[in-house]
Structure formats: structure tokens, C-alpha cells
Amino acid sequence: MSVEVRIPTILRTYTGGEKIVTAEGASLQELVANLDSTYPGIGERLLDESGLRRFVNVYLNDEDVRFLDGLGTEVADGDSVTILPAVAGG
């Protein structure tokens, strides 16, 4: 299943500057693993030992995956995943 993944500026060093890449997988977990095999190092920027990093937001077709099934969220051919780093300020 081919899924379009939108990469934030801060992570484009891993994708050779590409803003949009494609990845394969039946779940978000598989998709991240596929991204990391194609773009080594990107996985550790997205995940920690407990799952998605706290300050990384991931959206599947504009739905926050934290309110779906997290890393177990199923993805389908033609879906769109957007990765956004959380922004904090004071």
C-alpha cells in the first residue's frame, strides 16, 4: 500500500530535502518502519521506547492518530500522513 507522507522541514535532512515521500505499510507502525528503512534515522526522531514521541503529532487524512489507534492505526493505499512537530512557546 502506497501512502503519501508529508515531512516537516526539520526532518527533511533525512529525506534529502523531500517535502513529500511515499511509504508502504498496513499500519502506522509498519509505515514508520518502512520510512526508517528508506530514510535511516527518521524513525528514532518519531518514536521512543513507549511509541510516538510526545512532541510529534501524526495525522492520517487530517485525523490525529492519538485519537485513533496510535501506531496500530491501519493505513490504506492512497491515504495521506502528515508529520508535525509540536510547537511550544511562552
Per-region residue spans from a language model:
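Ubiquitin-like/PB1-type beta-grasp interaction modules and other compact soluble beta-rich domains
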Residues: 1-89
